């Protein structure tokens, strides 16, 4: 067989670029037509009946500087996507008309030309991008989108107040060799609303209250909780073991600390422990004492106190009559620095670190004796007691720290046991109160 030359084996050379261009053009036209698997794409609005109730009254949505979430929450069910293709779902808001609206005599009427259009912002669903199977397995919920009247940051959509908007859901196919492609945009007339900074229609307000009890625009949860706590406090006071206690001890004005429920109980302490058990002893009586520089909640270090302390308290209550308050001028320093039982450490007056007691007052003072103790009593106890016997506010003894070391003596231990505070609030947990 005769050998073939190299030229005969070489493939024929001619230009095929026009063929490649033709194939690319066909692919582009097919992409514009859409994937055959997406021909049956459907998007259905959830909670249609609820949206219709608001739409009938002209729905309103609050916009704030920091952003406010929508109610009703926009949610839609998607069907007809390619389960194996990647999609992103977006939300934006288009102007429903060319009016600025105003609320007059119980109805919304056009109020002039619209303001300039705000910068177009779209909210990308946090699950984007994802497979079509993911978007179709459950409703797509836009509960995290926030409406704002200022352009602040991600997760917020800027709208003009007193303008009507219509939410639009966009589905975009992403990934693969083809470029991003809009599959479809969907909107629903029932979801139209007017952006407001405060609800105008009382009927809309009532619907919001009925179906969304956590809406902040019309229901102040904090005030509601405060009123509930106050009721609990009064109930506890009526069944208190010490009904003779007045507003001087745990005043409602917070002279010795805020209300027991002011701080979030996230520290893990039981609400009934320690001084918090006396949360119901507050009354309407105005506190005669100035508040400390830092308000504290009552301590949870202990649940009860001994018989001696109880007797000491009961015997001292008689000193708190209104006519004895005239002596406050001579005991201002003692009263103002008297610490509250606190669940926070290192909050005891600095004078307690050098003197055995923390401002024990005399019988002429409106403050009862024997309420507080210090874990390091010293020989300066007698000095403080002697000074207060003459109506003077106790002061630090000035002894060096080396001399204040008698905490283990039997005499000091016995003396400290007789001055337990209600709830046994320990000075070791409250050292350094300023």
Curated annotation (Swiss-Prot):
SUPFAM superfamilies linked: p53-like transcription factors (SSF49417)
GO cellular component: chromatin; nucleus
A Pfam family reported for this protein in Swiss-Prot or TrEMBL: T-box
Keyword terms of this UniProt record: Activator, Developmental protein, DNA-binding, Nucleus, Transcription, Transcription regulation
Main location: nucleus
The entry's DNA-binding region: 50-220
Compositionally biased tracts (Polar residues): 355-364, 376-385
Tissue expression notes: In the developing embryo, expressed in the mesenchyme founder cells, vegetal plate of the mesenchyme blastula, extending tip of the invaginating archenteron and, later, in the secondary mesenchyme cells.
Stored CDD domains: T-box_TBXT_TBX19-like (cd20192)
Matches recorded under PROSITE patterns: TBOX_1 (PS01283), TBOX_2 (PS01264), TBOX_3 (PS50252)
Location of this chain's protein in the cell: Nucleus
GO molecular function: DNA-binding transcription factor activity, RNA polymerase II-specific; RNA polymerase II cis-regulatory region sequence-specific DNA binding
Listed InterPro entries: p53-like_TF_DNA-bd_sf, T-box_DNA-bd, T-box_sf, TF_Brachyury, TF_T-box, TF_T-box_CS
Region (Disordered): 355-385
GO term, biological process aspect, one: mesoderm formation
Keyword Nucleus: yes
Superkingdom, taxonomy of origin: Eukaryota
Free-text function comment from the UniProt entry: Involved in the transcriptional regulation of genes required for mesoderm differentiation.
Protein name according to UniProt: T-box transcription factor T homolog
Organism phylogeny: Eukaryota, Metazoa, Echinodermata, Eleutherozoa, Echinozoa
């Amino acid at each position: 067989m005769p050998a073939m030359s190299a030229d005969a084996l070489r493939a024929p050379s001619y230009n095929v670029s026009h063929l490649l261009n033709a194939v690319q053009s066909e692919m582009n036209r097919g992409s514009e037509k859409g994937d055959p698997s997406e021909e049956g794409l459907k998007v259905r609005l959830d909670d249609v009946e609820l949206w219709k109730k608001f739409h009938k009254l002209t729905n309103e949505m609050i916009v704030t500087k920091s952003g406010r979430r929508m109610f009703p929450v926009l949610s839609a069910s998607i069907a007809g996507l390619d389960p194996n293709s990647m999609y992103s779902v977006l939300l934006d808001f288009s102007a429903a008309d060319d009016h600025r609206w105003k609320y007059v005599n119980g109805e919304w009427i056009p109020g002039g030309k619209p303001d300039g259009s705000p910068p177009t912002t779209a909210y990308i669903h946090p699950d984007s991008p994802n497979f079509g199977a993911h978007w179709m397995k459950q409703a797509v919920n836009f509960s995290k989108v926030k409406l704002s009247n200022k352009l602040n940051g991600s997760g917020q959509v800027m709208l003009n107040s007193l303008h009507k908007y219509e939410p639009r859901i966009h589905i975009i196919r992403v990934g693969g060799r083809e470029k991003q492609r809009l599959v479809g945009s969907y909107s629903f007339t029932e979801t139209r609303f007017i952006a407001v900074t405060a609800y105008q229609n009382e009927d809309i307000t009532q619907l919001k209250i009925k179906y969304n009890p956590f809406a902040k625009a019309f229901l102040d949860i904090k005030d509601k909780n405060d009123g509930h706590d106050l009721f609990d406090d009064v109930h506890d006071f009526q069944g208190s073991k010490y009904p003779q206690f007045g507003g001087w001890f745990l005043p409602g004005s917070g002279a010795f600390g805020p209300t027991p429920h002011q701080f979030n109980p996230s520290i893990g302490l039981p609400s009934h422990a320690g001084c918090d058990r006396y949360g119901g002893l507050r009354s309407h009586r105005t506190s005669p004492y100035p508040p400390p520089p830092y308000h504290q909640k009552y301590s949870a270090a202990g649940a009860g106190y001994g018989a001696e302390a109880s007797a000491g308290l009961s015997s001292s209550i008689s000193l708190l009559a209104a006519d004895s308050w005239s002596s406050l001028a001579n005991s201002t320093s003692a009263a103002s620095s008297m610490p509250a039982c606190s669940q926070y450490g290192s909050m005891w007056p600095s004078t307690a670190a050098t003197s055995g007691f923390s401002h024990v007052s005399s019988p002429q003072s409106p403050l009862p004796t024997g309420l507080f103790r210090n874990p390091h009593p010293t020989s300066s106890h007698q000095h403080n007691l002697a000074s207060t016997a003459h109506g003077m506010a106790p002061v630090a003894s000035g002894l060096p720290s080396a001399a204040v070391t008698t905490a283990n003596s039997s005499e000091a231990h016995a003396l400290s046991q007789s001055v337990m505070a209600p709830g046994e609030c320990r000075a070791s947990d409250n050292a350094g109160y300023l």
